[in-house]
């Protein structure tokens, strides 16, 4: 969602990018507009002319124009539209949308434009690229669309496809922070990427960048070391995404998706509960992971590691954990949204579990009561 005022809007309006199920007729998603927050009207053609598009990923207001990008396609990968294009309109009420970029910024391996944000008078866009790693592009949106875009970071910040996707973008203290991830929770089986934990980089207005959280490595700009001293995933292998970042009361927050809670259900054989990890050409990693899980036990992994991580920093380099166990609920696998308000800092969790959950017993899988299932909203206030 975003607040935007176009030429035909008498005042700022709320614009929303919803999700349209293919089961409801398959007409494609539409951008919605609301003046009062109660009534919403469509202001875009279904799927921008593509009935297979069920939703849009980002919705950004920049220089009096509204930008968005489709993120999926019915019958295809969860994050692969028919064309990875940024769309723009100068007046949403006139229902006139045009391509603001060439498909994939000229790279067919850019499967989607995953996130966008405004920083330093430019629009930044981050992609999902399972072959070479994410790319970050920027434009000043001058002239007529499609606009001229400039690459800022390529090849997953020289980590390759282990930085498959830009998942989160947040402006903080005159710099742009990028959180990475691998689709499907840190392990992309379709493209055989990962498993691997996520990183954070920091981009400056002059397009130079720092590695904040991640793996040290050589780059075309010299060797990069994580300025926080923390490895990928804040040192937690299970943190497959930096899913959301936000600012509140002078602090930068980063929330993760932690897939450790899914271990008992991931590629498990009900007979011996061994885990056959597909590690994208890294058989030694898969074997080591299997041995680790077997020695510790998947239930103990969930007990001590289950639940998202939330970290905060006042300078973007020194980080402190707020929680590493989903606020005590292992079924809170991810931080899905953050909102700073005068009343405090709101956080919404991703918790896909229901009122019952499957538990392994000597007799096999059994469903038991699970009062911790379902999404939660938390409010943080200064003490």
Task: Briefly describe each language-model feature range.
Residues 3, 9, 13, 22-55, ...:
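Trp- and S/T/G-rich repeat-edge/linker motifs of beta-rich repeat architectures
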Residues 13-17, 65-69, 122-126, 175-179, ...:
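Conserved beta-propeller blade signature
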Residues 351:
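Short, well-ordered, aromatic-rich surface patches in folded extracellular/luminal domains
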């Amino acid at each position: 969602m975003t607040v935007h005022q176009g030429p035909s809007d008498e005042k700022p309006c709320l614009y929303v990018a919803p999700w349209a199920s293919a089961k409801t007729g398959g007409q494609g998603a539409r951008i919605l507009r609301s003046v009062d927050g109660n009534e919403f009207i469509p202001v875009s053609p279904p799927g921008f002319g593509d009935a297979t598009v069920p939703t849009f990923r980002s919705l950004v207001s920049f220089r009096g124009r509204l930008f968005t990008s489709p993120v999926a396609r019915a019958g295809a990968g969860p994050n692969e539209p028919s064309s990875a294009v940024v769309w723009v309109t100068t007046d949403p009420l006139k229902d006139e949308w045009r391509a603001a970029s060439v498909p994939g910024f000229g790279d067919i391996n850019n499967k989607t434009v995953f996130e966008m944000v405004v920083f330093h008078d430019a629009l930044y866009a981050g992609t999902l690229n399972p072959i070479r790693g994410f790319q970050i592009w920027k434009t000043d949106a001058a002239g007529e669309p499609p606009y001229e875009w400039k690459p800022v970071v390529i090849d997953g910040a020289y980590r390759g496809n282990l930085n498959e996707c830009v998942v989160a973008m947040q402006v903080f203290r005159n710099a742009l922070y990028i959180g990475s991830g691998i689709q499907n929770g840190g392990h992309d089986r379709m493209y055989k990427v990962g498993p691997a934990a996520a990183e954070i980089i920091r981009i400056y207005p002059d397009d130079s960048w720092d590695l904040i959280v991640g793996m040290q490595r050589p780059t075309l700009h010299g060797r990069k070391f994580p300025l926080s001293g923390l490895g990928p995933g804040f040192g937690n292998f299970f943190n497959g995404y930096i899913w959301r970042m936000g600012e509140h009361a002078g602090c930068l927050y980063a929330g993760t998706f932690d897939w450790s809670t899914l271990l008992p259900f991931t590629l498990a054989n009900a007979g011996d509960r061994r885990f056959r990890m597909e590690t994208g050409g890294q058989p030694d990693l898969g074997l080591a992971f299997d041995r680790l899980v077997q020695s510790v036990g998947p239930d103990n992994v969930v007990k001590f590691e289950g639940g998202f991580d939330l970290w905060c920093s006042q300078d973007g380099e020194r980080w402190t954990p707020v929680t590493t166990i989903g606020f005590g609920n292992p079924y809170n696998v991810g931080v899905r949204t953050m909102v700073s308000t005068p009343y405090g800092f709101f956080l919404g969790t991703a918790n896909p579990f229901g009122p019952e959950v499957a538990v392994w017993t000597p007799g096999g899988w059994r469903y038991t009561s699970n009062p911790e299932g379902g999404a939660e909203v938390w409010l943080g206030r200064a003490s």
